[in-house]
Amino acid sequence: MECIRVPKGKKLLILLTGGNRMNSIWKETSGSVSFELLNGVKSTDVLIVGGGIAGILCAYQLKRSGIDCILVEADEICSGITQNTTAKITLGQGLLYNKMLHRFGEDKAKLFVKAQKNAILEYTKLAKDIDCDFETKDSYVYSLDNRKKIEKEVDALNIFGIEASFSEARELPFSVAGAVRIKGQAQFHPLKFLYEIAKDLPIYEHTKVINLIPHKAVTNHGVITFLKLIVATHFPIYNKHGAYFLKLYQHRSYVIALKGAPHMKGMYVDESDTGLSFRNYDDLLLLGGGGHRTGKKGGCWQELEEFAKEHYPNAKIAAKWATQDCMTLDDIPYIGEYSKNTPDTFVATGFNKWGMTNAMVASKILCDLVQGKENQFADVFSPSRAIFRPQLVLNALESTIGLLTPTTPRCPHLGCALKYNSAEHTWDCPCHGSRFDEYGNLIDNPAADDHHSFK
């Protein structure tokens, strides 16, 4: 497929010239930016490790606050999970809010909602000056078979002051029991936005952190000393602290971009982890789904292609790609101090498939915390909050099974047995989500290096 970029303001045109590209449409329809690699010794107040949306927004907020910072990225910025998003900016993150109301109480749940709402407002304000295809949209979370759950979710959101209502979601190509409609949400082109945000930031690409010691990072191209550290590497890179290998697991999902499918006015997501999501970009319909825990079997692209063939028989697949998300134990991201034993080190992870909204939340919280300021949302998102959920037991069980499985190859992260993913021709870790290509090259962390036994 060849992506032809046309002048600003004209319609996007994608021509298929054989095969389906595995790059996201964001990668295919944005320009490029590049940054030099580190050379020698640098010093900064705040070092940010990770050049995805969370790291870039943290650097942006810090620079705007007059704080000296440096961001390092092992590859190129936005080359990981960020480029594979469906780019919805919304409170509609599944059926969260009735559950939160009863689990955490009204006060804590209201703070979570307020943080999300503030993030959407911040995007809206920033996007006024950036050509990033930003659009205000209504967001819908639908259920195939449980109207009562939808009604309870609407009631919970109304308690929190959010304008939510019950909808029959008639735009969908199938009938549903109902949907939560939330007005005033948004979608955008993430790379157009981030490339503009990043262009004046102190960023070093192809600069991989090899060793972290207190207030010093050793990279493949030099050394950086710092006062404070923000880890924004998708899955945190410290194994010794924070127990993130137990508090997180990774979930894989798939997207196809359909040309010739009907245009949808809203953004839609199933309340089920295994359901489908829908949003338009220009003349393409982005259909997401096929999800599964990384290292397990799932519907993958085949499920999406079969659905498209049945419901959109005249549509053509213009592109397809996959993404991966860190999932927490209680549906709330981990944003704040990395652990109680690591002062001056902070983390942003576990965005639970909603990285666009929660990355902005993280940037605002961490910008305050690294300056020693209080933040009203810090306790809600604190990585050290008391958590004991059934998922913790499941994560520990997966790790135990992975360690005891008498097969090779094994993941260099913590030694779990890798599983072959025939849909993507990769080796995936069911314990913590590391992924390698067929030659052992690292694709996704938390593993830090290639699998050398494949070479």
Predicted regions located by residue number:
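N-terminal Rossmann-like FAD-binding beta1-loop-alpha1 element of flavoenzymes
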Residues: 46-71
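Helical element adjacent to the flavin cofactor pocket in flavoenzyme catalytic cores
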Residues: 156, 179-215, 220, 224-227
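Flavin-binding catalytic cores
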Residues: 261-264, 292-325
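Flavin-dependent oxidoreductases
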Residues: 212-214, 219-281
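Glycine-rich FAD pyrophosphate-binding loop
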Residues: 64-84
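Extreme N-terminal leader/targeting segments of oxidoreductases
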Residues: 3, 13-46
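C-terminal catalytic lobe of FAD-dependent flavoproteins
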Residues: 315-392, 407
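Flavin (FAD/FMN) cofactor-binding and adjacent substrate-gating region
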Residues: 21-28, 95-101, 121-193
